[in-house]
């Protein structure tokens, strides 16, 4: 599934992501835009360390999810394949787990590059939140 920006914003708001970990809803949506282009089936198998990223939030198989390709910390206790389906509830739960670590949203390089310290005040302006 490819979400629209506003569709994802409403879904994340309903899941109490606005303010979660101290990050505004706009930060979460911005991160998803630049990590996956809002696509739940996004997959990146080209990380320098040989790891792969899965789904809407590009969660990594070294730390967050388990696949059959490598050993994993599997901190979200989930199979990576579950992060590629249209149900994003488990992706959201895992993202909440990621942001509880000391790095917070800086775990997502695309967020650091495109969203961190940017003026996101107008980013969701058209979404009728």
From Swiss-Prot:
Catalytic activity as recorded in UniProt: Hydrolysis of (1->4)-beta-linkages between N-acetylmuramic acid and N-acetyl-D-glucosamine residues in a peptidoglycan and between N-acetyl-D-glucosamine residues in chitodextrins
UniProt entry tagged with the keyword Metal-binding: yes
Keywords: Antimicrobial, Bacteriolytic enzyme, Calcium, Disulfide bond, Glycosidase, Hydrolase, Metal-binding
Cofactor: record remark: Binds 1 Ca(2+) ion per subunit.
Covalent S-S links between cysteines: 6-127, 30-115, 65-80, 76-94
Active site: 35, 53
Top EC category: hydrolase
Cofactor: Ca(2+)
Domain C-type lysozyme span(s) in chain numbering: 1-129
Record-listed E.C. numbers: 3.2.1.17
Pfam families xref list: Lys (PF00062)
GO MF entry, a single one: lysozyme activity
Positions that bind Ca(2+): 82, 85, 87, 90-91
SMART domains in alphabetical order: LYZ1
Gene Ontology biological process terms, A to Z: defense response to bacterium; killing of cells of another organism
SUPFAM superfamilies linked to this entry: Lysozyme-like
Protein's UniProt keywords contain Transmembrane helix: no
Further information: Lysozyme C is capable of both hydrolysis and transglycosylation; it also shows a slight esterase activity. It acts rapidly on both peptide-substituted and unsubstituted peptidoglycan, and slowly on chitin oligosaccharides.
Subunit structure of this chain's protein: Monomer.
UniProt family annotation: Belongs to the glycosyl hydrolase 22 family.
PANTHER family named among the record's database cross-references: LYSOZYME C, LYSOZYME C, MILK ISOZYME
Role this protein plays: Lysozymes have primarily a bacteriolytic function; those in tissues and body fluids are associated with the monocyte-macrophage system and enhance the activity of immunoagents.
Protein name: Lysozyme C, milk isozyme
High-level lineage: Eukaryota, Metazoa, Chordata, Craniata, Vertebrata
